[in-house]
Amino acid sequence: MSDVAQRLTELRKTLHEHGVRYYVEDAPSIPDAEYDRLMRELLELEAAHPELMSSDSPSLRVGGRPLDAFESVVHEIPMLSLDNAFDDGELESFYRRMTDRIPAVQHSAFCCEPKLDGLAVSLLYENGVLTRAATRGDGTTGENITENVRTIKSIPLRLQGADFPTRLEVRGEVFMPKAGFEALNARALKKGEKQFVNPRNAAAGSLRQLDSKITAQRPLAFYAYSVGVIEGGELATSHYQRFLQLKGWGLPICPETKLVTSLAEVKAFYQDILQRRQSLAYEIDGVVIKVDDIQLQERLGFVARAPRWAIAYKFPAQEELTLLNDVEFQVGRTGAITPVAKLEPVFVGGVTVSNATLHNADEIERLGVMVGDTVVIRRAGDVIPQIVSVVLERRPENAKSIVFPTRCPVCQSDVERVEGEAVARCSGGLICQAQRKEALKHFVSRKAMDVEGLGDKVIEQLVDREMVSTPADLFRLRAGELTILERMGPKSAQNVIDALNKAKQTTLPKFLYALGIREVGEATALNLAQHFLSLEAIQQASLEQFIEVPDVGVVVASHLQAFFAQDRNQQVINELLEQGITWPALTAAPVAVDSALAGKIVVLTGSFTQLSRNDAKAALQALGAKVTGSVSKNTDMVFAGEAAGSKLAKATELGIQVFDEQALIEFLK
């Protein structure tokens, strides 16, 4: 090894070690000036010898060349969100759901940590070196932000030690400490630049800079909270012990993280953090509670978007008084008419709130609210503004009643309210401009067709100018037509056309979700695709066939049937296919034709000790069974584990065959 190469190795090792001591252990061992001197020496040597550059060099923290755009990253294991609890009752319900499913949870410890108000990221380490960082995105697909993340000094570019897996994905939160946020805004104020509203926005904006040199100037920090991919090695079977392993490898862990042994201790942890919230160095909006035993986590499994073994216990919403100046009625993509309160702007929970939903006519009546009232505004879970009560003693004499419209405020079609539903809807369908706009916005959204650059304002202009009326019209647009829109030059117009062409290659679940069928979310769209395997089969399905799909009940099935029964919807679908929208063909898993389960409609209920519900479902489907989420007269058999509830009772009432876990294992052999 040459003298220069040896010195570079020494400098990188020294700077890595001191970086961990300073940013992770909060125990600096050399003066800042000495650290800066070593960094300058490293930069000078690397500039003089670019052939000796290393991907894990501490010098990368100063940022690299600007990017044209962020690349997409598909998460090998989805980054799910968490369900929320807002009071002790909801926390207890969460605990009861787990113990009903797996009684052993009663004897498990819980790992508790503050819920940081930042941005979730994924860090991939290969042979100990940080090779990729990505945002959470929609949970399935995020953005590659590796260059930006390398500038965050508390994130190690190379792990310490040697006992880590060869591939290890670390997940955590990037945030901006309060002191750093205040200093950043003070500098912006001094320079006459725009200030950030809150630390979370500042962190998110900093991470999404195309120029990593800007990110490098922002005071960002990181705490790890879980792992994803683990290959070529093993981690502890305790969530808390995994934290200690990560810390040993140089990754920062929130110092408030605590292991507790009972629900009472969980509540005590919550109260302690709540009382100390303002004194913490970072913004939080609750605490996260996780079952500590990794095997129990695996047995509990997941629902569509969240794990069953973890929950976010949110802090009480922050409330303020303000005036209700007016109420506007907005029309959504399914025709739902929502009253929106126009408020005197008020700062609540870190943001200025000027609008709040009043939900529907029933909610207005329940609140007894009138225009001109002083109202209590709350950001539930520090996120969604809502009016929770009226200060009646402050009601002015000229307060006005809120009258729900009988005609659509946009297209003047009749407003209808189906018996048993709280929501009133415009009956205009696609002749209603508001519904067209919202349907198109949904169609191009990230979780649907994911058309980059086709934002809300562009959609509104396209509809207002009568350039599009259905989703298929979007794919008929030409770049030259788009340049008449505001802030749409030739390059931007071509980018939109390129994005539309790229979006033509999609998946059947995304296409179904993009159609905007009432109450058909991502999970239902995925179930439909996996059940029917083709669009043609879905288009021709009966109500009874829709009900056979896992987690599709009578209400959703009726919405599906009504949607595909309308000629105009079928016409739009055909036009989209004519424009070249395609997706990979789906095939059913190989089925053993002599299986006793082939073609049977099966329901799983209760908890199983020898395999997870997801594993049981997959094994049953591989043998040709159709696994559904509810018991009906069409169900052939029910497999009941421990603590089986209403599904078992209904199966018994209907005279359906019920088998225990051991019988399930025998069927699967």
Curated annotation (Swiss-Prot):
The protein's required cofactors: Mg(2+); Mn(2+)
Residue sites binding Zn(2+) per the record: C408, C411, C426, C432
Keywords annotated in UniProt: DNA damage, DNA repair, DNA replication, Ligase, Magnesium, Manganese, Metal-binding, NAD, Zinc
Any single GO BP term: DNA replication
Xref: CDD domains: BRCT_DNA_ligase_like, LIGANc
Pfam families from the UniProt entry: BRCT, DNA_ligase_aden, DNA_ligase_OB, DNA_ligase_ZBD, HHH_2, HHH_5, Nlig-Ia
Residue runs in coiled coils: none
Gene Ontology molecular function: any one: DNA ligase (NAD+) activity
Protein name from the UniProt record: DNA ligase
UniProt organism field: Vibrio cholerae serotype O1 (strain ATCC 39315 / El Tor Inaba N16961)
